[in-house]
């Protein structure tokens, strides 16, 4: 049965505790692939479908910053978009003063050569492999500890 969508409320796809990936728009399927690949490496991650560029779900962002060591915001948009709104909120709410690492994976603020979408995303680092590398760099200590435990 379909549930009503609350305006400004994100949807948590998977719940974890190390890294939270907050995706908006067309990047959700790619982020699901990244989460699956991280899980195989022993990382327990959260995936959020932001659903709304405005208003942003500040309650969820507050919770994620308190319960996760890192946050990766992913959007197929450029400077001044959703990721910028989230970062501004995190700064103003004091979350950037805490121990949470925050990164944004977005399109560059430049012209992208005409090509197939997958090639363009790979070129700008928004493909699954590039996002996986960014995520791993944020939580490398956690992945190394998980791999040691399985050895």
Regions found by a protein language model. Name each.
Residues 1-151:
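Thiamine diphosphate
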